[in-house]
Amino acid sequence: GSFPKYGNDDDRVDEIAEWVVSTFSSKLAKQHTYRNSVPTLSVLTITSNVVYGKKTGSTPDGRKKGEPFAPGANPLHGRDAHGALASLNSVAKLPYTMCLDGISNTFSLIPQVLGRGGEHERATNLASILDGYFANGGHHINVNVLNRSMLMDAVEHPEKYPNLTIRVSGYAVHFARLTREQQLEVIARTFHDTM
């Protein structure tokens, strides 16, 4: 539909995400805990977004039955259509004070979006993007700078990429060690090609 989608720096929907985190956190805080511990919350999935997605029916946002959920605090694959910075801004709005165990954002860019002037320019531009994310309240980010086509080739020809390491959701792994289903989920994620 034409409704607003999380991941596009649109307060109409980003405020719903903030509300969900705040409401869940406040309800969790009211529960009795073992040894009077302080409950904390995290927004991360490792790879459970694939497993839980397989067991869950369709959702109101258009996700089909059996499809993976978004990893961590990421927008659902392809929903963040207004560029890399808009996606980062949406995630940075989530209230970290209520998620002290972390808000995981696994973020992928194609190398060219960081500039065409060489490695130094790309590194400088990436550092600027990360500085902005942290200045806006972001805390935890995993960054991949690569092309989707390379991952697709690595699925078919893993022997060509024995050391291809990617960030998944809070951890790094050799791409070949993921299950095929997990590899395809990573490939389906948004690879930002615009700022």
Curated annotation (Swiss-Prot):
It catalyses: formate + acetyl-CoA = pyruvate + CoA. SUPFAM superfamilies: PFL-like glycyl radical enzymes. Its EC number is 2.3.1.54. The modification Glycine radical is found at residue 170. Keywords: Acyltransferase, Cytoplasm, Organic radical, Transferase. It is an enzyme of class 2 (transferase). It is found in: Cytoplasm. Belongs to the glycyl radical enzyme (GRE) family. PFL subfamily. This is Formate acetyltransferase. It comes from Chlamydomonas reinhardtii (Chlamydomonas smithii). The lineage of its organism: Eukaryota, Viridiplantae, Chlorophyta, core chlorophytes, Chlorophyceae.
